[in-house]
Amino acid sequence: MLQHPATDFYDLAAANAAAVLTARHTPPYSPTGLSGSVALHNNNNNNSSTSNNNNSTLDIMAHNGGGAGGGLHLNSSSNGGGGGGVVSGGGSGGRENLPSFGFTQEQVACVCEVLQQAGNIERLGRFLWSLPQCDKLQLNESVLKAKAVVAFHRGQYKELYRLLEHHHFSAQNHAKLQALWLKAHYVEAEKLRGRPLGAVGKYRVRRKFPLPRTIWDGEETSYCFKEKSRSVLRDWYSHNPYPSPREKRDLAEATGLTTTQVSNWFKNRRQRDRAAEHKDGSTDKQHLDSSSDSEMEGSMLPSQSAQHQQQQQQQQHSPGNSSGNNNGLHQQQLQHVAAEQGLQHHPHQPHPASNIANVAATKSSGGGGGGGVSAAAAAQMQMPPLTAAVAYSHLHSVMGAMPMTAMYDMGEYQHL
């Protein structure tokens, strides 16, 4: 492909459009063929070693007859040195000329690329409008990309989406076309909401309108980072979470990101890891607390079970049947209650344990308890008086271990 200064191609595009407009007022296409040639002459006159006079002329001709030849001619001559000329294209050359058009596909693509790089969108639009309706030309990738650029700058977003969704483009054009796709959707979303989009808003737009496969290689991205880039960063982070500025620059070149993006990725990753470690520490502490509580409960259980077994053994060793056992428990409870009352009202008097025992023995014998109850009463009469604290604790333990059948009415003993 020939490389020329941008200003020469501006003139080329303008002259081509003028020639096409002029040709439309002339008689229609002639069977003898339409030949067109674009000649670019560059004459360099070197008058001295310190001054150069450059004269450039651009000629475009469109006429009927003269064969089917056409091409772009670049002639260059120099008076001070050797002369040379470069001729591109020709009537009988290998390039196929478009019907009723003097330029080849390569030349049209070159004009489109130059006008895009120069940012001259208006001239590019006029040049595209002047192209003939030929499938080989209209489906050229450079022409399609130029149409997409013109549609974006004119606000014709539906036409832009149609071009990008229905035509496949090479990977070298994906980045530019992806930017057009996203910017167009951003502009539409901003007009709909009436305010500029932030980072979150743009992320939602990208999720709502994913890139078409015609301009995307299908590789998933995360926060605008491709999986390959993230994999490189993760591998480096596993070895060194704190890369130096030089290492960050190397990573940026390897991943295709900027140094700022690489630095921010490492900062965010370190912050997430610290938060995860803090959360794990809190969970471990709660687990240890619950384990210690369980151990304390387990250490208390044997003593409680031993106490319960001792109470059961005392109940089993008491003589008599079930009624006798219940009466013995009644007698013990009455003794402790009486001792507690005697200490509260008459601390200077001894416990009336003998009277309480006699009353309990009489009541139990009237109920048919037998001699077992009398023996228990006699044993209780011989017991020394108990202190208030010991009596209360013993009463509490006996009441807790007493079955429901052993409950009695304390109103019967109010006279005591």
Curated annotation (Swiss-Prot):
One of its GO terms (cellular component) is nucleus. The keyword Cell wall biogenesis/degradation does not apply. Keywords: Developmental protein, DNA-binding, Homeobox, Nucleus. GO terms for molecular function: DNA-binding transcription factor activity, RNA polymerase II-specific; RNA polymerase II cis-regulatory region sequence-specific DNA binding; sequence-specific DNA binding; transcription coactivator binding; transcription corepressor binding. It holds the Pfam family Homeobox_KN. Residues 42-57, 291-329 have a biased composition (Low complexity). It comes from the Eukaryota. Coiled coil: none annotated. CDD domains: homeodomain. Residues 32-91, 262-329 are annotated as: Disordered. Residues 218-277 bind DNA. Disruption phenotype: Flies specifically display visual defects. These range from reduced ocelli and ommatidia number in weak loss-of-function phenotypes to complete absence of compound eyes and bolwig's organ in more severe lethal phenotypes. InterPro entries: HD, Homeobox_CS, Homeodomain-like_sf, KN_HD, SIX1_SD. It is found in: Nucleus. GO terms for biological process: Bolwig's organ morphogenesis; circadian rhythm; compound eye development; compound eye morphogenesis; entrainment of circadian clock; glial cell migration; insect visual primordium formation; positive regulation of transcription by RNA polymerase II. In developing embryos, expressed in the eye disk epithelium, bolwig's organ and the optic lobe primordium at areas of invagination. In adults, present in photoreceptor cells in the apical regions of the retina, and in optic lobes. Residues 273-290 have a biased composition (Basic and acidic residues). Residues 79-91 have a biased composition (Gly residues). SUPFAM superfamilies: Homeodomain-like (SSF46689). Required for visual system development. May transcriptionally regulate genes necessary for optic lobe invagination and Bolwig's nerve formation. Belongs to the SIX/Sine oculis homeobox family. This is Protein sine oculis. It comes from Drosophila melanogaster (Fruit fly).
